[in-house]
Amino acid sequence: GLGVSFPSIVSQHGETLHNLNSDGVLENGRLLLVDAGAESLENYCSDHTRTYPVSGKFTQKQKDIYEIVLRAHDEAPKNMKTGAMYMEEVHKKALLSLAEGLHDVGLIKGAPQDAVEAGAMYLFMPHGLSHGLGMDVHDCEAMGERSYDFSEMKERAIASGTCVYRAAWRLHEGTVMSNEPGIYFIPALIDKCRAEGLYKGIVNYAKLDEYRDFGGIRIEDDVLVTETGSRFIGDKLLPLTVEELEAVVGSLK
């Protein structure tokens, strides 16, 4: 290939998005997030993320959160199909999957759908599920937005904290996009939302205190939208399951 498609992110602070500081010493019990990609000879970019247990074994708490993210990662391509509107049919469905998992571990109270509609998932995943991929690793970011009428969504978006970015994105056959759900525990963001009284009755802030030093987990692969649905790009995915990731780290010790 032609080298990396962007500066690699290798960090034990996965809760800090796009963290390029990778000079820390690995510590047992921490999670190591690796977000990297390569550029092909034809100048097309890839983008992948895996999160590894530094010790070689996930703790039960880490495993629980990882499995929630993995389920969202595996389910998302089912919604990535020709004609789908990204925000409503892809991004929000992934948020709902994450919310259901967070509800199961006690971090969200009430109906998971209410957490999505209230914008509470912003606290756990403050970024989009996907971005376009092409000759730029974030390709064609404003696709369709010049002619899109945001007026109907604006008031609701402001009230809920829901991002309208990429809301005009309609998927087509041949679209290449990332699939990167994540769950992050960002102390400053938790404190801010709590102090402002946001998401009361939805987020279990008392339980959330147990995760302040957790870090973050993201899983990312690249997807091609086809005539009949979508598929992951590549003959074989990088190690993905809890068992596979533990085996990778174990082989290095």
Feature names for model-found ranges:
Residues 1-253:
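Active-site neighborhoods and metal-handling regions in enzymes and metal-associated proteins
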